[in-house]
Amino acid sequence: MAFKPLHDRVLVKRVQSEEKTKGGLIIPDTAKEKPAEGEVVAVGAGARKDSGELIAPAVAVGDRILFGKWSGTEVTLDGVEMLIMKESDIMGIIS
């Protein structure tokens, strides 16, 4: 299913966290927190200034990003859990 976010919204796929610690301990599902890191899958056209001028998004498809723990709305598209969030919820791009 194709999905195109509107305005300054971004579709993000969470990056899976490691199931083992560096010391080799396996982390059970009940103890895992959802990662606050993801990959941008789709980007809207951008926000608009009061004058109506379009502000281009700072992120692009494929960017790896860091976002707040409670950011976005969870959705399932084609059986994959994703997040839709405003661009302002993104803290930065990981390079």
Swiss-Prot record:
Disulfide bonds: none annotated. One of its GO terms (biological process) is chaperone cofactor-dependent protein refolding. SMART domains: Cpn10 (SM00883). Pfam families: Cpn10. InterPro entries: Chaperonin_GroES (IPR020818), Chaperonin_GroES_sf (IPR037124), Chaprnonin_Cpn10_CS (IPR018369), GroES-like_sf (IPR011032). One of its GO terms (cellular component) is cytoplasm. The keyword Mitochondrion does not apply. Belongs to the GroES chaperonin family. This is Co-chaperonin GroES.
